[in-house]
Amino acid sequence: MSEDDVDNSVKDFESGEENEESIGRVILPNKKKGEMFGIVEKMEGASRLSVMCEDGYTRNARIPGRMRKRMWIREKDLVIVKPWEFQPEKADVVYRYTKTQASYLSRNHMLPEVIDIFK
């Protein structure tokens, strides 16, 4: 990395202009894999939660083992869930958004109106 590259990145940061890179950093649900947005309604214990999904259904979601200790999920958190193929009333949590990421998605109208509680 040359000094010119460093100077340009600092200039972009200082000017406050959003470039294409900043938009690409927020993870979005992969619709081809069946992933969707959801809002955590209730913690049910034992790594289970009740999630209101963007299609209007409330699903029983579970937190996979790889995320249990690493990512703490609370009520009213925005998450990405993937419904099970053989039991569509259940789902797995794929990703949890921070409050900053969720408000960014809401401001840029990337959330469906059904679950946009950040208005």
UniProtKB/Swiss-Prot annotation:
Coiled-coil intervals: none
CDD domains: S1_IF1A
SMART domains: eIF1a
UniProt KW keywords: Initiation factor, Protein biosynthesis
Residue ranges of domain S1-like in the record: 24-98
Superkingdom, natural source: Archaea
A GO term for molecular function: RNA binding
Positions of the UniProt region annotated as Disordered: 1-24
PANTHER family assigned to the protein according to its UniProt record, in alphabetical order: EIF-1A (PTHR21668)
Protein's job: Seems to be required for maximal rate of protein biosynthesis. Enhances ribosome dissociation into subunits and stabilizes the binding of the initiator Met-tRNA(I) to 40 S ribosomal subunits.
Family annotation (HAMAP family): aIF_1A
Entry's family note: Belongs to the eIF-1A family.
Protein name: Translation initiation factor 1A
The organism of origin for this protein: Thermoplasma acidophilum (strain ATCC 25905 / DSM 1728 / JCM 9062 / NBRC 15155 / AMRC-C165)
The encoding gene: eIF1A
